[in-house]
Amino acid sequence: MDTMGRHVIAELWGCDVDKLNDLSFIEQVFVDAALKAGAEVREVAFHKFAPQGISGVVIISESHLTIHSFPEHGYASIDVYTCGDRIDPNVASNYIAEALKATATEVVELPRGMGPIQLEKPKVKVL
């Protein structure tokens, strides 16, 4: 293994506003994303803000998945961090982007535990 983990940071734009503000939907999507990636779910905690927006985390044996949604902007900020090399965090990230109906994504993947971080240009995809 070359890294201690892989950390995907994704900006999701043009998301379905109603889905971004649906606590049950977001929670289920994140649990499903973790399972589809092959992760083992340990704990789930999500909070809906008034008047809108959701923040949450799915703790997995391999690390975590997080979201901060901004329905008023059709935007979600997500992180998927997996330790080791058994699970591809992009599987979960892509599943979440599709479920939220994102029309554009910007994704950066960071290798973790390798010393100074060297950022590559983000991968931008217009869907």
From Swiss-Prot:
Gene Ontology biological process terms, A to Z: spermidine biosynthetic process
EC number: 4.1.1.50
Cofactor: pyruvate
A molecular function (GO) term: adenosylmethionine decarboxylase activity
Site (Cleavage (non-hydrolytic)): 62-63
Co-factor remark: Binds 1 pyruvoyl group covalently per subunit.
Pfam families attached to this UniProt entry: AdoMet_dc
Pyruvic acid (Ser) modified-residue sites: 63
Record's keyword terms, sorted: Autocatalytic cleavage, Decarboxylase, Lyase, Polyamine biosynthesis, Pyruvate, S-adenosyl-L-methionine, Schiff base, Spermidine biosynthesis, Zymogen
Catalysed conversion reaction: S-adenosyl-L-methionine + H(+) = S-adenosyl 3-(methylsulfanyl)propylamine + CO2
Protein's pathway: Amine and polyamine biosynthesis; S-adenosylmethioninamine biosynthesis; S-adenosylmethioninamine from S-adenosyl-L-methionine: step 1/1
PTM text: Is synthesized initially as an inactive proenzyme. Formation of the active enzyme involves a self-maturation process in which the active site pyruvoyl group is generated from an internal serine residue via an autocatalytic post-translational modification. Two non-identical subunits are generated from the proenzyme in this reaction, and the pyruvate is formed at the N-terminus of the alpha chain, which is derived from the carboxyl end of the proenzyme.
InterPro entries on file: AdoMetDC_C, AdoMetDC_fam_prok, AdoMetDC_N, S-AdoMet_deCO2ase_core, S-AdoMet_deCOase_pro-enz
KW Cell inner membrane (keyword) present: no
Active-site residue numbers: 63 (schiff-base intermediate with substrate), 68 (proton acceptor), 83 (proton donor)
One Gene Ontology cellular component annotation held by this UniProt entry: cytosol
NCBIfam families assigned to the protein according to its UniProt record, in alphabetical order: SAM_DCase_Bsu
Assembly and binders: Heterotetramer of two alpha and two beta chains arranged as a dimer of alpha/beta heterodimers.
Function (record text): Catalyzes the decarboxylation of S-adenosylmethionine to S-adenosylmethioninamine (dcAdoMet), the propylamine donor required for the synthesis of the polyamines spermine and spermidine from the diamine putrescine.
Family, as annotated: Belongs to the prokaryotic AdoMetDC family. Type 1 subfamily.
Entry protein name: S-adenosylmethionine decarboxylase proenzyme 2
Species: Halalkalibacterium halodurans (strain ATCC BAA-125 / DSM 18197 / FERM 7344 / JCM 9153 / C-125)
